[in-house]
């Protein structure tokens, strides 16, 4: 029983309603992604490959579920283990500067080292732009989650290591960017 003797109105949600809510969710996410890209452009991000990565990689899958409604806002958000995902502007800026600093064209045989896998979002961006990404994370649970998400997108060009980033990855050095 629900309030004052009324039956709970939502014991079973019809499939049509579930489908409609998923469609609405997709439309909202696409709209928020487009708005985020405009914010990044307004803040000076110009590299079209970087903007395309930010636009297509589903950031909402990399954050804590309680914050999913804020996934495409330009701010850091909690992920797990007291850590946060960087705000999209920082991800875009670091990636844009890395591309400029390594003098690489997208698609060249380049390899980069990422210190701190975290959520795996930055890793996914790098994996779409570089041939090889070596990513170090000190918190095993974060590394395993990031690896699982990124492999589900077919990003097989990432090598993960559970270690302290201060130690680097000497057996794979040198890197074209860090």
Positions of the model-derived regions?
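Short hydrophobic targeting helices and cationic amphipathic motifs
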Residues: 3, 7-9, 18-20
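Alpha-helical and His/Cys-centered functional microenvironments
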Residues: 11, 23, 91, 126
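Composition-driven detection of intrinsically disordered, low-complexity segments
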Residues: 12-13, 20-21, 119
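Short, linear, compositionally biased motifs with a strong N-terminal bias
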Residues: 15-16, 130
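Short, Lys/Arg-enriched N-terminal segments with co-localized hydrophobic residues
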Residues: 16-28
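Class I SAM-dependent transferase core
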Residues: 25-113, 142-144
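Conserved nucleotide-cofactor-binding alpha/beta core module
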Residues: 99-177
């Amino acid at each position: 029983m629900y309030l004052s003797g009324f039956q709970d109105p939502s014991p079973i949600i019809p499939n049509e309603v579930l489908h409609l809510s998923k469609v609405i969710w997709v439309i909202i996410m696409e709209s928020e992604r487009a708005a985020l890209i405009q914010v990044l452009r307004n803040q000076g991000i110009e590299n079209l490959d970087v903007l395309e990565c930010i636009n297509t990689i589903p950031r909402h899958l990399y954050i804590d579920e309680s914050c999913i409604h804020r996934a495409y806002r330009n701010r850091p958000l909690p992920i797990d283990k007291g850590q946060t995902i960087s705000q999209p502007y920082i991800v875009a800026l670091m990636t844009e500067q890395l591309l400029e600093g390594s003098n690489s064209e997208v698609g060249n045989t380049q390899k980069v080292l990422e210190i701190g896998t975290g959520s795996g979002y930055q890793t996914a961006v790098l994996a779409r732009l570089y041939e090889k990404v070596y990513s170090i994370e000190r918190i095993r649970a974060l590394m395993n989650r990031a690896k699982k998400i990124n492999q589900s997108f077919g990003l097989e060009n990432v090598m993960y290591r559970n270690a302290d980033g201060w130690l680097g990855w000497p057996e794979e050095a040198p890197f074209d960017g860090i």
